[in-house]
Amino acid sequence: INGLEQSDAYSADKENLASFKLFTGKKSLSEILKIYNDEIASKGIKPASGGHIGYIPGGGIYSSAISDFLVDVTNEFVGMNFSCPGGVAIEHVLLDWMKDVFSFPKTAVGNLTSGGSIANLIAMTAARDKYQIKNEAISKSVIYLSHQVHHCIQKALKIIGLEDVIINYLELDDYSKINIDSLKLKIKI
């Protein structure tokens, strides 16, 4: 943990599947932690590394890790008020604060998710439902994306039953932003 800031942001090493083989014996905590370090924590993307700037996960933020630990140990379910009124209250306070930060109306609603994939799934579901995209309207509906779109968007489309929409890919400008002229042209067609 002390070396996270200087650690590599990515390791291309492949997993050792034999480490995950199911068996009926026992392993000590130190053996399990070694497997975790060797096969989980040291391979692939290292979001807690000081060199990783791809997105903003929980990363190496100590207070965030302790919060996750506490919730996991006490097995809190903050998905509804009945099961964890305090956890739901914290979510509402944070959402109200975010509404103020972004000048959203007091009537705006939302939720805190585990990450961007679920956030995009919720947003696409909300858009589908708001515009009542169902049945024969699906194959006539158009979504505009760039080739730099996150892979979770295509997964979300499939999950919510919109895999048959028309997808128009837009060009990007020199700053990797969607080219507005390209968007306007595609919408006119």
Predicted regions and their residues:
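Conserved beta-loop-alpha segment that forms the PLP phosphate-binding cup at the N-terminus of a helix
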Residues: 91, 95-96, 107-136, 153-156
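Glycine- and acidic
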Residues: 74-82, 104-111, 137-140, 165-171
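Active-site nucleophile and cofactor-binding loops and adjacent substrate-binding regions
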Residues: 83-87, 110-117, 145-147
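N-terminal entrance/gating region of PLP-dependent enzymes' catalytic architecture
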Residues: 1-107
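Generic, well-ordered alpha-helical scaffold segments in large soluble proteins
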Residues: 35, 39, 93, 97-101, ...
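Short glycine-rich loop/turn motifs that provide flexible caps or phosphate-binding loops at active sites
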Residues: 50-53, 114-115, 122, 175
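PLP-dependent aminotransferase-class I/II
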Residues: 114, 137-141, 145-189
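Short, solvent-exposed polar/charged micro-motifs at secondary-structure junctions
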Residues: 59-63, 120-121, 155, 177-180
